[in-house]
Amino acid sequence: MTALPPHSPAILPAQPFDALLDLPDDTRVHTLSNGVRLLVIHQPGAPGVSVSVFLRSGGQHEPARWGGISHVIEHMAFKGSATRNCQQINLDAERLGAEVNAHTDRDHTAYQMRGLAAHTLPLLRMLADLVLHPTFPQEELDRERQVILHELTDVEDDAYAVAWRLFDQAAYGRHPFARPVIGSRSSIEKLTRQDLLDHLQQRCSGSNLIVAVAGPLTAEALLPEVEAGFGHLAAGAPNQVEPARWIGGVRIKRHGGSSQSQVVLGWPIARLDQLQPADAVAAAVLGEGMSSPMLDELRERRGLAYHINVVAEQQELGGQFVVEGATSPEQLPEFLEGSLALLRRHADRVEAIDLERARHQLLVRSLHDRERPMRRLEEAAVDLFVLGRLRGNRERLEALQSVDREAVRSRIETLLLQPPALAITGRAPAGTREHFAGLLKRFELPLDPVSPLSS
């Protein structure tokens, strides 16, 4: 429980929220006849522009034999199109001063360019060419496959990344939601050029594609270019996957490159489409900032870790409430005990000052996000894919403002009724599984009856 120091101000009124509810809603969506959506954040007078294409195709949409194929396609999109080879793609973007980026997630792939507002239309044309007309030259695929295998080696050498991979497996078993986006060494080595072409044809359709622009041009000015570049796509059906079922369990793996214990501990929470704002507030209550209970107690007062984070991840197929950090093997039992004790304590009572802090921290984060066009575009695109609509500024802030202490306490109490998933990499003392099971019993928390101490 966080004590209220004598010099702390009284709990602040709600005016900071009220003053921000009426921020202008500058986001618009237009849908083409084939289902392609044009998402525009209008920024009059802005000298720069952010242009993105989001494809509803990621790791969760892949068959097991093609694990990592979305990520390979993302890499290969820049290696040649119907009108440009790899070098021409790089030159055409860089002669305009454009920054080019792309990434693959579980639920979508993003292709992004940021440049001068005067170059908005050329950037749109380039993205249409790269995303819709890649040629996947065999010689480029052979080279890029090696690059991706090196990237995979980096991931495998990172105890933190391995801990998250093990956590996903403990939480969701063999569901596609648990598979690593980068794939496996065997699947990457086996992918062929025809596999890439087939997968793109299956997944890239109008209903699964969003063209997004943040800059000074209006949607009306952009529509002709979007129609020309993307209007020929077949509409297709939305790429959908059944939600993941939470399993829970323990995964521990020794990682020779780490002298610490990397810990990822979590429980199931609401999916994104279930719109449960109390989950995010609960994560902020427990672990946002140095004065939060997790950091104040486990780091500042007990010195159990340097890095501790609490996050509520709500995605299309599942949600997870996670406490993650790194500690020494000797302090691992105390770190686990302290984390569970704080969760159990907050399932009984949430302090007003912690709720005040969390709400204001989330408010400030929301304001910072408004200043990051790429982040706003991606967040809005995910809303369109999952919810079929945008959540405006007022809706988001009113949802945050509506969360009270009882809502946070109740959400923590509810998540603790489910079996946790725990992943530990690096070093862990002998008997860690049994110790964790004993802690769960002590705090009257459930352990998965199917595989309580899985390895």
Residue ranges and their predicted role:
Residues 28-33, 252-256:
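Short acidic-hydrophobic surface loop/beta-edge motif
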Residues 42-43, 52-54, 237-293, 446-455:
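His/Glu-based metal-binding/catalytic segments typifying zinc-dependent metallopeptidases
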Residues 1-13, 27, 31, 42, ...:
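Charge-rich, well-structured scaffold segments of protease-associated domains
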Residues 57-66:
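Short pre-active-site segment immediately N-terminal to the catalytic Zn-binding motif
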